[in-house]
């Protein structure tokens, strides 16, 4: 087992799961390590396998479609199930021959599979049988039907011919929607809210207008393994470090190496700094949405020293440039430790006073309490992550479930609420700020000595030569918005397939049950409550289901970094 045995202890229950999948469902193990087991099952058994894993407590993290025709003349769909309570993942592979490219849908037994199945259809061209037909998820309506961008015969710089677009929405009888394409929008996003009077009865979302093809770029000749961290940290303007950390952990697993302990501590410290500044940003935005601009300004004032700390530790306010395969570029010396501790002491005191004030403001409690409710069963069905899950009573946090990096050396609690409303999501994030401060203090106190780069990762041995082809790895880290997941299938000198699942991708489908039955006036806060990772969702189209009349409402100003992959 070597270096890999340091990732997670072997789980005795995993053997029973593997036995069930192989003996009862006709599967076979294609790869295994302590934290992961990959099992290929026949197409006809997929739905029963998914039902068994789901009923055993698994959450569907995502599914990754892969064009394996150059390897075995077939397509494949990898379903990543997380056995969170046991601390390991079961990756279920199902293959589809290129001349019969279909797999059964599992969305009726695992609703969380909805988006990733549609993405597999759009990007690879796999037919999902047994589910209702819906419009495209990722590709625009004027994209040619027979071109699927993540197939290996489509180059990364391919420009498709234009075709006549199909109309997505019936035109309203009256009203002119502004968005998703409008000069006043920082980035285009589209919400369609159906209302009766002033009550929301249903909601639809159309995103991916600025899909950047990052996964395709990562597989292209332009990017080697050494360049992937640079690309990964640009997935999101807020969660850049957690994305680069996830990508790097996957590559380190595939290479059979692990960063030195000191480097892991430094990564964990930066991840918590990132969580603090992200949560403070969100709390300020929430105060603004609720009409309490004094709270917005004070929260962002308190946040600014955290940005200065980020620059002190990483060299960049956006935490870019620190991560490398095998370690980190910069160390933390005694002077930096003193500055971090002093800044966090002041931050803790100021934010405690502000947080007590915020949650006591009558208009905040009245607007946030009892609105945007997501029940525990709904959260479970959709496999939501992060503060959204924990506010609905789901005890999900990768730092506890799959203790990675230095988190096993820190003692901290996971804020948990059962109300599932907007106020609960506010309180989870407020408490997490204090927990992150506590984690950083502990890690600084326990910061070990030693190198910050693995001995194999040097100029003498290029990183691209350390990662052999044909390996699999799944890496996950707890981003501010929830679990971030990267799936890696290695190729020659670069990824064969690199799948990224940002937390907002998992949480946006939950907005539909959260918005239903609530007053239209509360929709902006409910949408903001998941901390959606796209820049400036400024507009929503509102349609009265009785009259057909449409109008456009403004959601909020400002914005955060995009996670449109």
Region annotations inferred by a language model:
Residues 43, 111, 141, 153-565:
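Metal/cofactor-centered catalytic core regions of large enzymes
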Residues 1-203, 278, 343, 364-371, ...:
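Terminal low-complexity/charged segments
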């Amino acid at each position: 087992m070597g270096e890999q045995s340091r990732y997670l202890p072997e789980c005795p229950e995993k053997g029973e799961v593997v036995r069930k999948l192989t003996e009862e469902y006709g599967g076979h193990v294609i790869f295994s390590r302590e934290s992961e087991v990959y099992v290929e099952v026949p197409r006809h058994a997929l739905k029963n396998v998914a039902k068994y894993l789901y009923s055993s407590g698994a959450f569907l993290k995502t599914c990754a479609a892969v064009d394996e025709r150059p390897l075995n003349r077939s397509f494949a769909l990898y379903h990543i199930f997380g056995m969170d309570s046991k601390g390991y993942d079961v990756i279920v592979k199902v293959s589809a021959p290129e001349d019969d490219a279909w797999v059964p849908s599992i969305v009726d037994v695992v609703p969380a599979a909805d988006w990733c199945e549609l993405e597999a259809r759009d990007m690879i061209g796999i037919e999902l049988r047994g589910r209702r037909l819906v419009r495209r998820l990722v590709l625009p309506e004027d994209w040619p039907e027979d071109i699927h961008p993540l197939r290996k015969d489509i180059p990364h710089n391919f420009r498709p011919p234009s075709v006549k677009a199909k109309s997505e929405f019936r035109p309203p009888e009256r009203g002119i929607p502004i968005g998703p394409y409008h000069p006043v929008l920082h980035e285009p996003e589209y919400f369609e809210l159906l209302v009766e009077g002033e009550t929301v009865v249903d909601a639809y979302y159309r995103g991916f207008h600025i899909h950047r093809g990052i996964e395709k770029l990562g597989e292209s000749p332009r990017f080697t393994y050494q360049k992937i961290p640079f690309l990964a940290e640009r997935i999101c303007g807020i969660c850049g470090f957690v994305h680069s950390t996830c990508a790097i952990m996957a590559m380190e697993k595939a290479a059979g190496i692990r960063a030195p302990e000191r480097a892991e501590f430094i990564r964990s410290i930066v991840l918590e700094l990132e969580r603090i500044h992200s949560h403070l940003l969100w709390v300020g935005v929430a105060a603004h949405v609720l009409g309490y601009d004094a709270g917005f300004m004070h929260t962002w004032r308190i946040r600014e020293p955290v940005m200065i700390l980020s620059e002190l530790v990483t060299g960049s306010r956006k935490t870019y440039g620190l991560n490398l395969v095998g370690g980190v570029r910069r160390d933390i010396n005694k002077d930096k430790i003193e500055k971090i501790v002093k800044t966090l002491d002041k931050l803790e005191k100021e934010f405690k006073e502000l947080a007590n004030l915020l949650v006591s403001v009558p208009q905040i409690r009245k607007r946030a309490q009892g609105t945007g409710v997501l029940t525990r069963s709904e959260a479970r069905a959709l496999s939501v992550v992060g503060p959204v899950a924990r506010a609905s009573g789901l005890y999900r946090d990768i730092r506890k479930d799959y203790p990675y990096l230095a988190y096993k050396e820190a003692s901290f609690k996971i804020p948990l609420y059962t109300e599932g409303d907007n106020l609960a999501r506010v309180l989870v994030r407020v408490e997490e700020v204090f927990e992150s401060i506590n984690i950083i203090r502990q890690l600084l106190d326990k910061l070990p000595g030693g190198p910050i780069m693995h001995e194999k990762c040097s100029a003498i041995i290029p990183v691209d030569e350390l990662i052999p082809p044909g390996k699999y790895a799944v890496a996950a880290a707890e981003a501010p918005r929830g679990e971030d997941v990267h799936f890696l299938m290695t190729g020659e000198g670069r990824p064969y397939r690199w799948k990224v699942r940002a937390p907002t991708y998992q949480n946006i489908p939950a907005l539909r049950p959260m918005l239903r039955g609530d007053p239209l006036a509360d929709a902006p806060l409910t949408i903001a409550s998941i901390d959606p990772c796209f820049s400036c969702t400024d507009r929503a189209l509102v349609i009265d289901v009785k009259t057909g009349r449409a109008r456009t409402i403004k959601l909020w100003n400002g914005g955060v970094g995009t996670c449109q992959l």
